[in-house]
Amino acid sequence: MPQSSRYSDEHVEQLLSELVSVLEKHRTPTDLSLMVLGNMVTNLINTSIAPAQRKVLARSFAEALQASVREDKAH
């Protein structure tokens, strides 16, 4: 069952589009894009989340990421 969000699809899509535009503007290869985005997630967790909740949130984020990755052969 999809999770509901307090953020509109339009807002999420706008932010995603802007982030992708920055990466494309710099012709960022996939591995560097993943490194930068991973560092951004780590920074957000370490600076915005209470220490006692960081590991739980990181685990939840990792599980959500794994659940959203498709296994089809398209790329």
From Swiss-Prot:
Record Pfam families: DUF1414
InterPro entries, A to Z: UPF0352, YejL_sf
Domain of life, per lineage: Bacteria
Family (UniProt): Belongs to the UPF0352 family.
NCBIfam families, sorted: PRK13689.1
Entry protein name: UPF0352 protein YPO1261/y2923/YP_0880
Organism annotation: Yersinia pestis
